[in-house]
Amino acid sequence: MGYTANGLINRPILASIHTEAFQHNLNRVRELAPESKIWSVIKARAYGHAFEAALKGLGSTDGFALLDIQDAVWLREHGWQGRILLLEGLFHENELELAQELACDLVVHCDAQVDWLETFKAKNHNKFNVFLKMNTGMNRLGFKPDAYRTAFHRLHSAGYQVHHMTHFANADQVGHEPSVGGQQELFNQTISGLPGSTSLANSAAILWHRNALGDWVRPGIMLYGASPTGLYADIAHSHLKAVMQLSSEIIDIQELKKGDRVGYGGRYEAQESMRIGIVACGYADGYPRQAKDGTPVWVNKGA
């Protein structure tokens, strides 16, 4: 990132965040899921894009979804009055009072969290909205289907408003197991007859599985203008706009002969005599050293 000293930028590299692209991508979610409400996922300080920019660009969302309760504190302190979902719930029982004060919705994914909420409800009259997470095949967080209904009834009996959530493992891939259809079928069978809204779809499901959206969608990567597949064609076809723009300057030029090599390990070999530009940007700036060759670069703003 560029920084200032005595009014000058010492290095020309700069990451620019375009909040209007945030709004464009959020509108795209609304076009694809017009009947669903939106949890905009901004975990890890909006994936490095800064909460300030996310709050400005995504301020028309129905709710923000994040990981750390201290990030929920930040949102409230900066004027966000809408809903906040803690995607992994609480990590410690002593966070319950703060979560209640902040009016957070909680994901519940394990027995310990159910225990905490039962104990808390016995001592307090206020209620949380709870999204009970089902493990339908991703095998990360959530109750297996055979334990899910028991957890639901415990929370429901304690007086909580309980909603239903799962997460797709392969919404961005065809022919991989578990499939979106298989996970969705298992989810629907398990919650049959239970009250509460549903939340299933991540970015990939919003883009390519619009029969699996649910009442609340949870876009993450697509809000930032990237595709879940990592393919530029999918970004273009989905009409997304990149929120972050990385720019720098060419600070030197090297003249190469055929056979000269460039970079660590000599990974690029000149096939003919050529000139190459050296850009002020490297992995110390956050650009991955393992990034593949061939990344498109615009010189002189694409002129």
Indicate residue ranges for each PLM-predicted region:
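A charged N-terminal "starter" segment
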Residues: 1-105, 111, 118-119, 127
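Electropositive phosphate-/nucleotide-binding environments in soluble metabolic enzymes
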Residues: 16-23, 48, 52, 66-69, ...
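Short, surface-exposed ligand-recognition loops at beta-strand->loop->(often short) alpha-helix junctions
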Residues: 17, 146-147, 285-288
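Active-site loop/helix belt of alpha/beta enzymes
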Residues: 10, 44-59, 102, 114-129, ...
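Short conserved beta-strand and strand-loop elements enriched in small hydrophobics
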Residues: 294-300
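Structural motif
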Residues: 36-39, 62-63, 83-85, 105, ...
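Functionally critical, mid-to-C-terminal surface segments that flank or help form catalytic/ligand
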Residues: 243-293
